[in-house]
């Protein structure tokens, strides 16, 4: 944000017509227009089970603060257009599957190629101790980082246990087993 890269990308998208200013001053990305070729775009289920149509997405809030989506577009623009990488490979949590089409569409909108983005969707890792799930919550500050994990589990054991699973399948990572595996 401090470098001005996010603002520059938003300005470019406005200039190209991929975004517009809403009445409240927010800058909106025409998500459905650009992302449809990559799949379903941010449709949401209503209370009665039907799906709402895709809506335009906020890039810059009415208060002037950019969303993380705007920063993501700027990151990919920097990587592919400015630094000249041929491909970007992102690893996202599976809960972000609905964002793949809009990101690829945004890349097309700004003059890149959405096909140059590969997204690996990872399922969640459940940590287990004594056969019970380790309860975690980012909101309460009760989380175990990878650094924390590697203080308890040898790195080779962690690598082996993570790599024996496909990215698309959930992992029950047994801390007790990981320590035993190393011995």
What are the language-model segments listed below?
Residues 76, 82-183:
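Catalytic adenosine-cofactor/nucleotide-binding cores of aminoacyl-tRNA synthetases and other
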Residues 1-69, 75-76:
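Active-site neighborhoods of enzyme catalytic cores
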